[in-house]
Amino acid sequence: MREVISLNVGQAGCQIANSCWELYCLEHGIQPDGYLTEERKKEDPDHGFSTFFSETGQGKYVPRTIYADLEPNVVDEVRTGTYRSLFHPENLITGKEDASNNYARGHYTVGKEMIDQVLDKVRRMADSCSGLQGFLVFHSFGGGTGSGFGALLMERLSVDYGKKSKLEFCVYPAPQNATSVVEPYNSILTTHTTLEHSDCSFMVDNEAIYDICRRNLGIERPSYENLNRLIAQVVSSITASLRFDGSLNVDLNEFQTNLVPYPRIHFPLVAYSPVISADKASHEANSVQDITMSCFEPNNQMVKCDPRNGKYMATCLLYRGDVVPKETHAAVATLKTKRTIQFVDWCPTGFKIGICYQPPQQVPNGDLAKVNRAVCMLSNTTAISEAWSALDHKFDLMYSKRAFVHWYVGEGMEEGEFSEAREDLAALERDYEEVASDSLEEEGEEVEY
């Protein structure tokens, strides 16, 4: 089997994971105690979920996941919550003091004490897999544990499991509503560290998801649970083809092959459709054409940036539910006639399609309506560099006055790391600009190298 291990780091990572496992259990008919529901036992045994769950001798299913946080509060909620008997208690790892929003604490001082314990559990989990496919790492960019410990974990995974794919789901700091002052520092330091270790990073930003919840679901003041359930739908769509069968399956390595034209340019933009509230569901048609088109509207995208300002390099459309290949080809043909959707000229085809027949599931009494088909779009577009430039600008404002830098230096960081990380991100922005401007005339002049 092709197993996947999920690693959840820090508060954001652990809370997103809670919503994801809640949804996986519903999709596979697994109860909160890890045993199959009665209806599920009657059906044909489906081995798809062994990518995400391991089975014990008693017929209990245990998630292949590890929770790691430097402070115990969030993971304690898992230990006492509804799903407490689902997870293996040894795989819920917590420290005693948190990283206090400081990348250096998560990466150097506090994180160093915990990393070996986490890697030991990863090693045990990997040993029990027959064909480990790769890792999904969930963390935020802004927090101390998510940024610092997340980066440390990615570095160490590269050393121990060099060839395995590592996909990140990162919560990117929202442009307007920040949860901490030093978010720009943490984000840029962690991006610099993980840039060479991550194969593909799916970014979501809280502000964009707040807006989707407000606009499409009519929730006036969305909680983190509302946001995470929406993110869980996206993660579920991305991993559905690993867990269910479909006519066009996509595995972890295929994402990289189809979405990442150059190793550094690995930050696809995520969009999901349809997001409709239960009371509006009956009035929407939701044809394949409609949901495909709505993915290209900035309103349905999970990061605040405008794709109309950039060019698409590659796009992956993952359909699930009642969808046949013929309809998807028709939808893509229509997309290609739209003038607003511009592809770079060196990538003429640009669409990878995946279809999974399992319809999307919704959490009972949740915000999302039951729909019979959905699509998740992952697109590598040069517009996402807008997100970087906004963050770089904030970093520059603080760093020009060396504000808050002493907290990082006091935890054993060199001040040079800041400027090194900032230069790396400036280079990343330039990479995106070059890709966008690489028209064929310029190619002719640059043949020397």
Curated annotation (Swiss-Prot):
| Substrates-to-products reaction catalysed | GTP + H2O = GDP + phosphate + H(+)
Chain sites annotated for binding Mg(2+): E71
Tell me the Pfam families matching this sequence. Answer: Tubulin, Tubulin_C
User: Could you give a GO molecular-function term held by this entry?
Assistant: metal ion binding
| Top-tier EC class | hydrolase
- Where is the site Involved in polymerization? Y449
What GO terms fall under cellular component here?
Answer: cytoplasm; cytoplasmic microtubule; microtubule; nucleus; spindle; tubulin complex
Instruction: Cite the InterPro entries for this sequence.
Output: Alpha_tubulin (IPR002452), Tub_FtsZ_C (IPR008280), Tubulin (IPR000217), Tubulin/FtsZ-like_C (IPR037103), Tubulin/FtsZ_2-layer-sand-dom (IPR018316), Tubulin/FtsZ_GTPase_sf (IPR036525), Tubulin_C (IPR023123), Tubulin_CS (IPR017975)
Q: Where does GTP bind?
A: Q11, E71, S140, G144, T145, T179, N206, N228
Keyword rRNA-binding listed: no
Tell me which Gene3D superfamilies the record gives. Helix hairpin bin, Tubulin/FtsZ, C-terminal domain, Tubulin/FtsZ, GTPase domain
One Gene Ontology BP term is:
nuclear migration by microtubule mediated pushing forces
Q: What does the function comment of this entry state?
A: Tubulin is the major constituent of microtubules, a cylinder consisting of laterally associated linear protofilaments composed of alpha- and beta-tubulin heterodimers. Microtubules grow by the addition of GTP-tubulin dimers to the microtubule end, where a stabilizing cap forms. Below the cap, tubulin dimers are in GDP-bound state, owing to GTPase activity of alpha-tubulin.
Assembly behavior: Dimer of alpha and beta chains. A typical microtubule is a hollow water-filled tube with an outer diameter of 25 nm and an inner diameter of 15 nM. Alpha-beta heterodimers associate head-to-tail to form protofilaments running lengthwise along the microtubule wall with the beta-tubulin subunit facing the microtubule plus end conferring a structural polarity. Microtubules usually have 13 protofilaments but different protofilament numbers can be found in some organisms and specialized cells.
Which family does the similarity line name? Belongs to the tubulin family.
Protein's name in the database: Tubulin alpha-1 chain
Gene name as annotated: tubA
